[in-house]
Structure formats: C-alpha cells, structure tokens
Amino acid sequence: MSPAKKSRSFPPISECKSREYDSIAADLDGTLLLSRSSFPYFMLVAIEAGSLFRGLILLLSLPIVIIAYLFVSESLGIQILIFISFAGIKIKNIELVSRAVLTRFYAADVRKDSFEVFDKCKKRKVVVTANPIVMVEPFVKDYLGGDKVLGTEIEVNPKTMKATGFVKKPGVLVGDLKRLAILKEFGDDSPDLGLGDRTSDHDFMSICKEGYMVHETKSATTVPIESLKNRIIFHDGRLVQRPTPLNALIIYLWLPFGFMLSVFRVYFNLPLPERFVRYTYEILGIHLTIRGHRPPPPSPGKPGNLYVLNHRTALDPIIIAIALGRKITCVTYSVSRLSLMLSPIPAVALTRDRVADAARMRQLLEKGDLVICPEGTTCREPYLLRFSALFAELSDRIVPVAMNCKQGMFNGTTVRGVKFWDPYFFFMNPRPSYEATFLDRLPEEMTVNGGGKTPFEVANYVQKVIGGVLGFECTELTRKDKYLLLGGNDGKVESINKTKSME
C-alpha cells in the first residue's frame, strides 16, 4: 500500500542550498529545460520521422491540443500530440530521430540553475516526465548524465514494429502516476530531492525528502552546450531553429515561396559562366565572401592545383569554382547519377577503392585543377573530422581552403533524408551565406615528395591550418562515426540503401 499524498508547498529552486545529494528526481519540461512546452519536440518527430505534411497536421491541431490540455486534462493534450506525431511510424525511425535530431535542440534548452542542482547529485539521478521515454532517453543519459528516465511508454505493433499512436498502461505519466512511478523505482528509500515546475508535479515531489519549484522567470538562462556531459558534434534534421508554434507557422508560410525561390536560384545560375555567378548570387540574396589569394589556372602542360577543403555542404566545390571564376573538377562519394548530371561543374564519383581512386585523381590533376574534401562527409558544428591522407600522396601543389556557411531556416545536409534535395534546402533559406578563404599553397617542406613528410603528417597539418583559420576544433572522428550515430549504418552507399530499404 502506497503512502498517502501530503499537501505541501515548495520553496523556489533559488533557495536550494549548494550541497550534494545522493538521489534526485526531476521533471523535464520547464524544470531541467527552460521551455515548458514539449510541442517543438513532437513537431521535430512529426517532421523528421514522418513528413512535412504530418508536421502541418500537428501544427493545425495545436488549438485542439491547448483546449484539451487546459480544460480537459494534461494527459489528453499530450495523448493528442503523441498520436499525431507517432502513429504509423516505425519505432526505429523515432529512436534515430531522438538520438540524431532531438538531442541538439534539447541541449540548447537546458536551464542553468536546475541543471547545476541536478548535476550535483552523487549517486542516482532520475528524470520523471510525461514525454515518451523513446524521445528523451538518449538526451537525458548522454547529455544530462541521468541514470534513468521514468516516462510515458509508447504502444508498438509487434508485427510491423510501428507506433500505434497510443500509450501503454498506466497512461501518460502525469500527476499521481509520477508519484507511483517514483515509489516503484525508489521503494522505501525516497529521493533526497525533487524538482518540478507545475502543480501536477507536487504529487511526486511530496514524497521526496526535499522539494523545490522551478518557476518561470525572465532571468533564467541556459547552460552552455559545452558544459553538458558530451559535446554535440553530429546531428541531423532539416530544421535549423527549434519549431515553436510561431517558428513552425513561419516555416510553413515560407515553404511554398522558399521552394520556388530555391528552384529559381539553382536553375537560373546553372547555365551561367562561373565568373558571373558571384554577382547573380548577390542579386538573388545569396551572400558570398571570398578571402585570400586565388591561384591562376595551370599553364598548358603543367599539372593542376589540388584544392583541399573542409566539408560543410555539397555546394563546397561549386563555391570554389565560382570563387575562381572557372570550371573545376571535383571528386565525391555517395552521389546520385541525377546529381552528377545536374552539377554545374565536372563531378567524378569515387569508388572507395584506394588504388583505383588515387589513379583516377592523378589523371584528373594532369588535366587541370581538382577539388577534394578529405573529411569524406559534412560536419555542421565547429569541428573538423579526420582528414584522409590519400590526397597528400597525389600532389605537392596543395592549396588548403577554409569553408563555412550560414543557414537560418533549413539545413542543406542530411544523413537520413534524400541527398538530392540538399542544395534545394540550402537555397530555400531566405538569406544563406557562404565563405571561402584561400590559404597559401603548402610549402615544399610540408609535402610528401618535396619535404619527405608522411601522408598522415601532411593531412594533419592541413587539417590544423584550416581549423586555425575557422576557429574549429580538430578531431579524429570519421565519416563512419557520424553515420553510425545518426543513421545506424557505416556511411557506405550500399549500407545507406540497405538501411532505407528496411525502413
């Protein structure tokens, strides 16, 4: 028989003494997170695991959700969000989105004062939330350092492994169900501390030895992302900003105009000579910044320069061609035939056979300049992945170029999505910008043939130089690391296609 509930009032978290606790139970929305609403995160699941159409249905249903939440029950409002966002989606896709997309948005929303209290707990940190466990568990464990999540469990069809849109018994974890979950988890040893932000949290806070309310205040701030338990290096998803109701409305109002603008930006510039495109970009609202000395084209009979870039989007080689004002060949992995056909510059697909690829690139360098991105994949955050050393074996005429871009509404890269649409999403941004900084050609003493350096030394040196210019941190992470985290595969074309065919 469970203990009777106690009627208590709780002091604000500002009165919580700076001391360590052995165990803590804390709510998520409005407590550990600054935002009290879980709508943006359900919207992300609806769009990224479902579709833009599902996201639109969720947005249009928001008035019904609010009415149900305020005038019927908190549980019903959340059930509606879950049904629209989850119904018919494979649970594996929801898990991938939770790990690859939601963590970045959750991490940017962590409330400083409550996280500091939560983090001081020495032994047992539990998050109790009305949100589905599948949504929040990767974030809570990997970035908050939580030990367990007590939340709503999603019902899954065992035959199709798709979410039904309903929840398992006892239902959405709110009010007294949170209290019962805490009692089941902790038994007679109640948590030392309970944190909540609303009246329905009083039920579980009342059985904690101490309880504090996290009130909504203008002075509340978020924790710097680098202060969390892990760094956010890789993330996926098309949306740049957290889709609050207002942001989501703006996105859907902009979508038809943005798509038409994107198509015009792509195909208007496609037939134009590269030396003119820089100016048409500015006219069409695309800001291009070019810095450093741009080498002239190679003289007849001489090998070309090897331009080595960090990789931000699939547009990197095209930006180099525009900056140089001439056609330039690029090599790439994981690109469709249609993308190769529509590319405004010559693009050669590599095979990941080291010997064959090296021979092919040497042939291309004999004919002219060549662009290569040795990271092998894009990275959105201010980090550089490990540079493959193959490029250092090909030429001593190496020109590093530091690339960066800004996107305000949509991300022009994806792991789980269709890569063909990457440039279109980039150009759907109202005012996208790109920066290319040409660095000095590598001195002879820093090359393989002229200076006796190993290919790995050259690759690490180029990575360090580019990272220094951009202010990015150099890492040893690879394409495989990124795709295993975000896509559940090793990043090879055949693996990606196999993963998608199973979805």
Swiss-Prot record:
A motif (HXXXXD motif) lies at residues 311-316. One of its GO terms (biological process) is cutin biosynthetic process. InterPro entries: HAD_RAM2/GPAT1-8 (IPR056462), HAD_sf (IPR023214), Plipid/glycerol_acylTrfase (IPR002123). It is a multi-pass membrane protein. It comes from the Eukaryota. Widely expressed at high level. Highly expressed in seedlings, developing seedlings and flower buds. The keyword rRNA processing does not apply. GO terms for cellular component: membrane. Keywords: Acyltransferase, Lipid biosynthesis, Lipid metabolism, Membrane, Phospholipid biosynthesis, Phospholipid metabolism, Transferase, Transmembrane, Transmembrane helix. It is found in: Membrane. It catalyses: sn-glycerol 3-phosphate + an acyl-CoA = a 2-acyl-sn-glycerol 3-phosphate + CoA. The chain crosses the membrane at residues 42-62, 64-84, 244-264. One of its GO terms (molecular function) is glycerol-3-phosphate 2-O-acyltransferase activity. The keyword Transmembrane helix applies. Gene3D superfamilies: HAD superfamily/HAD-like (3.40.50.1000). Esterifies acyl-group from acyl-ACP to the sn-2 position of glycerol-3-phosphate, a step in cutin biosynthesis. Belongs to the GPAT/DAPAT family. This is Glycerol-3-phosphate 2-O-acyltransferase 4. It comes from Arabidopsis thaliana (Mouse-ear cress). The lineage of its organism: Eukaryota, Viridiplantae, Streptophyta, Embryophyta, Tracheophyta.
